[in-house]
């Protein structure tokens, strides 16, 4: 059966009937091969031809305008790069290759007896644009298990980090050290053809994703479990299950939560700090280890990956001040006090979204199913009813609705993972699925070195005809 999405129908109309056969990510027969690299090798020439045709016809078309405020405002809303794996709609939220989170939850393969999608399936979708079969997902699970072992120098490095070194710093350093294993770096030094770049980027990306749970688990065990062993990878288990086992958690609900968490945090289009960083560094032909390590340094920033930690701190302070069973009016007063003191309510608002984040919604549904009476969840649910109205009354927020960070920490706390400093590491492991999928395609499509033009304030004033003051 051939599938055609709404966006792809629009693209087909734009290109005209004679070129519509090139819309391979929109109208296609699902691949039957279980080897992801083989599937990619078949797709890439068709996608290259599609983009070549599109650029030949529309390369000079103007797609927007840039204002002075955009330059000073972090380039918000500026259309400036191609990112294939996901698109963030202000009203609908994230779509992975055109599929919403509820659709992914329904369509992606599950573990035996499980209800949440396997991240392996999401990775296949991000790379190929196709919903994988159970056999294809099982192939990815086995492939990652086979590639998971860490080189001895990385193990030694992790075991000798000081305990006061932040978990994200440890993650970034360990990933950088894996650069010694890069097949792309070796192949590039040997002068491989540009048309082969993607093959080695693929191999490095698969290796890195496979090894990340081992790195992350060692960091956790060294910091919080007295350096106890992470154990061995079980090739019969999926990626998330192995990860939770290595962390030391065996609760089946927590394993399901990890599958959901690693799926929904994987990608959020290309303009966020971690995704853009990996894209930028990768454009210099740095290998995936270096590009991803750079992305993790961005994710470690408090304005990007530390938000769920800030939510928990705020919730904890709220409980200490008001107690666990608090009235709606007292909550309203507390929220107003937070806002009137010049602070924000953490976990609410988003740079792009203008509705409730669907990543929040699916975590809320998980909590309603598995921990409806948990005091911290009940507080989060109560805030969901109150905070948006207060923010609307205040009149400053463009988006008064909760984002993913308003909920994720609460779920981790419930299942016993209390170490808030570690949460961003989980975010990082998940984000690898998205940014490395795109990195493969960036090299397959021959994207050049990213080099935008910068301007000084004086130069900008001259450009717009303003008088210098």
Curated annotation (Swiss-Prot):
Pathway: Carbohydrate metabolism; tricarboxylic acid cycle; isocitrate from oxaloacetate: step 1/2. GO terms for biological process: carbohydrate metabolic process; citrate metabolic process; tricarboxylic acid cycle. Residues 1-31 form a transit peptide. It is found in: Mitochondrion matrix. Keywords: Mitochondrion, Transferase, Transit peptide, Tricarboxylic acid cycle. Oxaloacetate binds at residues 359, 431, 451. Its main location: mitochondrion. InterPro entries: Citrate_synth-like_lrg_a-sub, Citrate_synth-like_sm_a-sub, Citrate_synthase, Citrate_synthase_AS, Citrate_synthase_euk, Citrate_synthase_sf. GO terms for cellular component: mitochondrial matrix. CDD domains: ScCit1-2_like. Disulfide bonds: none annotated. Its EC number is 2.3.3.1. GO terms for molecular function: citrate (Si)-synthase activity; identical protein binding. It catalyses: oxaloacetate + acetyl-CoA + H2O = citrate + CoA + H(+). Pfam families: Citrate_synt (PF00285). The active site is at residues 304, 350, 405. Key enzyme of the Krebs tricarboxylic acid cycle which catalyzes the synthesis of citrate from acetyl coenzyme A and oxaloacetate. Belongs to the citrate synthase family. Homodimer. Citrate synthase is found in nearly all cells capable of oxidative metabolism. This is Citrate synthase, mitochondrial. It comes from Amblyrhynchus cristatus (Galapagos marine iguana). The gene is CS.
